[in-house]
Amino acid sequence: WLKQLFNSFSSFYLHHFLKPRFKHFGKNVMVLNPQHLKVFGENISIDDYATLICAPDKRIDLSAWQTDKISGEINLGKYILISPGTSIRSAECITIGDSTMIASDVVITDSDWHGIYDRTDYVARPLPVTIAKNVWIGERSIILKGTEIGENSIIGAGSVVSGKVPANVVYAGNPAKEIRKLDKEEFKTRESLFTESSTYLLDLLSIEENILKPNSFLGWIKSIFWPK
C-alpha cells in the first residue's frame, strides 16, 4: 500500500506541477521520482512514451533560458530514455530524436555560457545541438554546442563531443573520434517496446511488484533510521 500511495503522489505531482511547465507534454510520459525533475523555461517539449528516471541524489535538469538576447528551446522525441543526473541546458535549440537513450550524468549544452575573452558575455554565440533518432549516449559524456549526431550512433562513456558525428558509428574519447562503424540493418529501437507489446507498461508494473514483494513497511522504516 505504501508503494501505491507513493505512485499516486508521483502521478499527482507530475500532472499538476510539472506538466503545465512544458510547452508540449505527450501521452504516456513516464517520470520516476518526478519531484527530482527540474523544468526551467517555457520552450520545453516532450513527446509520447518518453521515460525519465530521476533520483534524490541525481535529479534531471531541463533548462531553456530566456532573456532579451536568447531564447532557449528543448525538444525531446518519442520513446526516449533519460537517466539520472542528466543535464540539458539550452540558450538556442537542443533537439533529441525518437528512441534516443541517454545514460547517467550526461551533459548536453548549446552554449559556452561565457565568452573566451569577455567573461561578462554570458551567452557567447550559442549553436544548436541536434541528436538524431536511436542514438545512445554513454555515461558522463558531454555534448557541446553545435554538435550533430547521426541516426543510430553510439557515444562512448566519458566522451567529449563537438562537431558532426556521422550516422551508424561509435564515437568515443576526448575529443571524441570514430572507433568503428555499425550495421544500420541490425538495430531494434526502444519504439518496439511500446509498439510491439500492448502490455509493456503492465509488464513493468508486474516486474516492480515482484521485486518489491519481500519488502515491508517496517523494513522501509529501518532502512531510513537504522541503515546497515
What are the roles of these predicted feature ranges?
Residues W1-T109, A132-K133, E151, A167, ...:
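Domain-scale signature associated with acetyltransferase and cell-envelope carbohydrate enzymes
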Residues S87-C93, R140-I154, S159-G163:
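Beta-rich strand-turn-strand
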Residues D112, R119-D121, T147, K181-L182:
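Conserved catalytic-core motifs of eukaryotic protein kinase domains, centered on the activation segment
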Residues V129, G146-T147, N168:
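A short, glycine- and basic residue-enriched loop/turn
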